[in-house]
A protein has these predicted regions:
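Short carbohydrate-recognition loop motifs
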Residues: 55-75
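Extracellular/luminal beta-rich ligand-recognition
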Residues: 110-155
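Extracellular carbohydrate-recognition regions
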Residues: 26-47
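Bacterial N-terminal signal peptides
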Residues: 10-21
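Extracellular beta-strand ligand-recognition surfaces/modules
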Residues: 112-117, 152-162, 166-208
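Extracellular beta-strand elements of beta-rich domains used
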Residues: 35, 194, 213-216
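Solvent-exposed strand-to-loop "edge" motifs in beta-rich extracellular domains
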Residues: 93-99, 122, 177
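Extracellular/lumenal carbohydrate-interaction signature centered on repeated Trp-anchored short motifs
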Residues: 79-90, 163-166
């Protein structure tokens, strides 16, 4: 049987980003969603192979999105136009049930993650669209960054790695502006979307992740 690999999400998002649904107008921090009324309509789902189940739940007293993947790959993305120079910091909380035994950041057949949060930087020239992926890595050491095995236009940054903190809520804060510069050696254009994704289609495994509210912090 031929192994199917999902196309990197940030490329497909080009078809959904010509008209952005939200533009931050005031100089203040941006909370994408607090999940108090379910998942807002600003979030859209893109399926690649099967569908990861995304639902709002109460987990450890926190409202969050629970993602359940069983050999599937789909993502939730939130269209938002913002300048990383004005909103350089990305903040979120997450928790995973497990990492993926067959997951490998260097191989196409291992390009699955129990959890990832990423930012898409669209371009009118599709081959110039880029993405910064913050991953809960399977093998890549924490703090390291590598190109996605499908394309060098997607940078994979291991914010967490391995099983040490499985089952624990972790708070993350990343300097998106600096991460983009380190990944691609240049200043970023405006961003067009923030996405969350739990995918296991390439490895055929299972994973559950919980995502707390995502915020963009004003400089």
């Amino acid at each position: 049987m031929t192994q199917r690999y999902h196309t990197p999400l940030f490329v497909l998002l080009l078809f959904f980003l010509p008209i952005l649904s939200y533009y931050p107008a005031l100089a203040s921090d941006i909370l994408l969603d607090d999940y108090q009324e379910g998942i807002r309509r600003n979030w859209k789902e893109k399926s690649f192979k099967g569908s990861t189940q995304y639902e709002v739940v109460q987990e450890d007293g926190r409202r969050c999105i629970k993602a359940t993947s069983n050999a599937s790959a789909s993502a939730l993305y939130y269209e938002i136009d913002f300048d990383p120079r004005e909103y350089p910091f990305l903040v979120w909380r997450w928790k995973v049930s497990n990492i993926l035994a067959k997951g490998d950041e260097f191989k196409k057949e291992g390009d699955d993650y129990a959890a990832r949060v990423y930012v898409v930087f669209p371009s009118a020239l599709f081959w110039r669209t880029k993405a910064v992926n913050y991953i809960w890595a399977n093998k890549l050491p924490q703090g390291q960054a590598v190109p996605n095995p499908f394309t060098s236009n997607a940078c994979m940054i291991a914010v967490q790695s391995g099983p040490s903190h499985v089952g624990q809520w972790l708070d993350e804060k990343r300097n998106l502006l600096e991460d983009y510069r380190k990944c691609f050696g240049e200043d970023p254009p405006k961003a067009g979307a923030v996405a969350i994704m739990t995918d296991t289609d390439n490895t055929g495994e299972q994973a559950v992740a919980w995502y707390g509210p995502v915020r963009l912090l004003y400089k």
